[in-house]
């Protein structure tokens, strides 16, 4: 299978994602520059963490208008798998591909730590190798990770199984302790924590590896974990 990793000016987690997919999981991976058109043939597109366009205006606000995002939107609306990690999550909300928004952390400080996450929905292309209710440890590094959404949309997301990960110890004030969500079609997913930073035994934590293995399992035709 073939993964595409979008690189914006200011991206800094693209290499980590590439390394995990290429060297740890032996997948075909290609970088996609923000000024390029999105080519055909990708099985999954990843928007990595970082500070796209310097986070000017607000996180993800400029990146959503990049040339490559035109293709990403078409790809997503056609059912293609799209993942946004940290800044990538912010971009997906700004682009309207995911509900809600990411704003300043409640404590108004940048947080860099490892935090417990609860897998709240295992029936998705991104979590099918986890067990529902499983608690994992994943690094976070963000200043604007406070997820906000209106009560009506939140209720709909809960009903439709769109909340995939919640914080065990809410570090940023996110509504409903939300750490990761997907769209109604379950093909577009965003999360603030960094699974790519917990996918190699050398780092002492492989809890994030099953995130990428879930995508691979789904693309190979495997069933989601009910």
Swiss-Prot record:
GO BP terms, alphabetized: 'de novo' IMP biosynthetic process
One cellular component term from this protein's GO annotations in UniProt: cytoplasm
EC number: 6.3.5.3, 3.5.1.2
Catalysed reaction equations from the record: N(2)-formyl-N(1)-(5-phospho-beta-D-ribosyl)glycinamide + L-glutamine + ATP + H2O = 2-formamido-N(1)-(5-O-phospho-beta-D-ribosyl)acetamidine + L-glutamate + ADP + phosphate + H(+); L-glutamine + H2O = L-glutamate + NH4(+)
UniProt cross-references to SUPFAM superfamilies, sorted A to Z: Class I glutamine amidotransferase-like
Catalytic site: 86 (nucleophile), 194, 196
Pathway noted in the entry: Purine metabolism; IMP biosynthesis via de novo pathway; 5-amino-1-(5-phospho-D-ribosyl)imidazole from N(2)-formyl-N(1)-(5-phospho-D-ribosyl)glycinamide: step 1/2
Pfam families named in the record: GATase_5 (PF13507)
GO molecular function terms attached to this record: ATP binding; glutaminase activity; phosphoribosylformylglycinamidine synthase activity
Keywords attached to this entry: ATP-binding, Cytoplasm, Glutamine amidotransferase, Hydrolase, Ligase, Nucleotide-binding, Purine biosynthesis
Superkingdom of this protein's organism: Bacteria
Keyword Hydrolase in record: yes
InterPro entries documented for this protein: Class_I_gatase-like (IPR029062), PRibForGlyAmidine_synth_PurQ (IPR010075)
Signal peptide: none
UniProt KW Hydrolase keyword: yes
Cellular compartments annotated: Cytoplasm
Subunit structure: Part of the FGAM synthase complex composed of 1 PurL, 1 PurQ and 2 PurS subunits.
Function: Part of the phosphoribosylformylglycinamidine synthase complex involved in the purines biosynthetic pathway. Catalyzes the ATP-dependent conversion of formylglycinamide ribonucleotide (FGAR) and glutamine to yield formylglycinamidine ribonucleotide (FGAM) and glutamate. The FGAM synthase complex is composed of three subunits. PurQ produces an ammonia molecule by converting glutamine to glutamate. PurL transfers the ammonia molecule to FGAR to form FGAM in an ATP-dependent manner.
Protein name: Phosphoribosylformylglycinamidine synthase subunit PurQ
Organism, as annotated: Alkaliphilus metalliredigens (strain QYMF)
Source species taxonomy: Bacteria, Bacillati, Bacillota, Clostridia, Peptostreptococcales
